[in-house]
Amino acid sequence: MIKIVGGIALGVALLVLALPTIVHKAGLHPEYNGEAVQLPAGKRALIIATNQAVLSAPGETTGDATGVMASEMTHPYYRFLDAGMQVDLASIKGGKIPVDPQTINRLLKTPEDDRFLADPAFLAKVENSMRIDDVDFTQHDIIFMAGGFGAAYDLGYSPVLAEKISEAYYASNEPVIGGVCHGVLGLINAKDRDGKSLIAGRRMTGVTDKQIKELGIIEITPQHPETELRKAGVIFESNTRIMDFLATLVVVDDEERFVTGQNQNSGRETAHRMLELVASKST
């Protein structure tokens, strides 16, 4: 009997140890190894993230800890940095960007997350991010909006962010604009010069309503990317799996100005596709 119990315990322990590998092979945080991009000196990227630290239901102020999903910030950060870019970090209010603690646990943590946790310069940027009001978006070649549940509370509600996205779109340097998962909510209120939706009629993606339901936050978070993008007139595209948490898709709009990723699995490819577009304009 003791041997049987011991065998079961060992099997459970081995399963727990293997879980990160299992979910990775199932589709979580897939590798993306496109052709290496190295940009000329002087190129700048701006990553925008949330200040929201509490997953609170409507009318409430308390709830579980939340924030940016680590990989949705770290994957693009290191892709841009390693391509030779200066990478700035901003948020709606400035100051600390909360990192959702669940997203740096053993099951979800990625090599880029480990690199971040040992990177004093990056950690300092997260603790003291720039306020978007104080950032000139037109001085950047890439503007990337990270997601995470926290972004559902502030990115889509910021008139300053919407205005600055519009300004960047019309800037002479034509920056590439994008984001992943809930980060795309930062695009929904951007306007063109006629006061109409800047993103209407464009092909885009973001986290699906299906995934939000599967994660159990459909009745908690105030905005849902698929719903809001469709309201803004976007031609919404997505992939689906038995669980959308394991799906991924990256969409480049026909004008090649916007690059959007479906969810946390899309950060590496989204960042790489943005780099490719910047590189194509630099030659």
What are these regions (language model features)?
Residues 177:
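Conserved, well-structured core segments that form or line functional sites
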Residues 181-183:
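Catalytic nucleophile serine of serine hydrolases
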Residues 2-174, 185-283:
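Extended, subdomain-level signal for the structured scaffold at the beginning of enzyme domains
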